[in-house]
Curated annotation (Swiss-Prot):
Belongs to the cyclin family. Cyclin Y subfamily. GO terms for cellular component: plasma membrane. Gene3D superfamilies: Cyclin-like. Keywords: Cyclin. Residues 1-13 have a biased composition (Polar residues). It comes from Xenopus laevis. SMART domains: CYCLIN (SM00385). It comes from the Eukaryota. Residues 14-24 have a biased composition (Basic and acidic residues). The gene is ccnyl1-a. InterPro entries: Cyclin-like_dom, Cyclin-like_sf, Cyclin_N, Cyclin_Y. GO terms for molecular function: protein kinase binding. This is Cyclin-Y-like protein 1-A. One of its GO terms (biological process) is regulation of canonical Wnt signaling pathway. Residues 141-263 form the Cyclin N-terminal domain.
Amino acid sequence: MGNTVTCCVSPDSSPKEGRDREVTESGEPYQAQGEPQDGDVQHMSVWELPIDLSNERNPSDDAQTSTIFLCKSQTDVREKRKSNHINHISPGQLTKKYSSCSTIFLDDSTVSQPNLRSTIKCVTLAIYYHIKNRDSDRSLDIFDEKLHPITREEVAHDYCKHDPDHKHIYRFVRTLFSAAQLTAECAIVTLVYLERLLTYAEIDICPSNWKQIVLGAILLSSKVWDDQAVWNVDYCQIMKDITVEDMNEMERHFLELLQFNINVTASVYAKYYFDLRSLADDNNLHFLLEPLSNERAQKLEAISRLCEDKYKDLSKAAMRRSISADNLVGIRRSNAIIS
């Protein structure tokens, strides 16, 4: 009952009697892992979890796990700080503004409405650290740029040996977002899908596949996140050298590798947003801060009310969809008797 695990065994039979005589390949007696000793009954929490539940530690699924890009960037951040300390170099501008009781400094980026330009810079910097500090060059043919080129330009024979810099990645992503008119939230979801793909498929993003992987993540996130989704043929008009068939095939493989898990919870989204802010702070990509004025305060209040009304409408719509014919979910009010 409850949290206690028990089993019923016949008094004249012992489940251990035959099992203890089993011998493994190494010649040692077999003993089940986690077997209780001295007749004690173990709790379910100490049992080994099945493999299917291992993805709970995936940062793109679990809000408690640190993002992969932030962990990969820490090596460069520590080396940069150590080098600056040894060479007595200032880490950057010492004119960072801090809020006080009389003045509050804010930027125009919030978790509900991030700044597009700053968010793309942070996301592409995260992709840059993924490529630079990758563990190996594991990849799949569907994402190989030479096997499936997205431009008619001839791919260099040593294309897999040169890591792209941050500016190159930023120009590639910014071109897609500007042409497709995508939002900053879509950029954050793109990074979530990218890290989920690397974890699920057990591959690395490297010079030979980064364009295909980033394009597939943007394509999928734009369809999931934006209300007015961009069609594959629209991306073919942006990148005129790729066919619709190739785009459809890449999207299909991307979804299969994600195991069709395109869900992004609010907590995971918020974690990626704030980790991107931390990444920007570690690399001196400071957001433009301005003093809080009455006009900006009213604008922030209007944005908050708009988001609050939006979430209320979504919750009401979900409630209406969940009401059955018997009105089991509906709120019932008793009739008042006025005497």
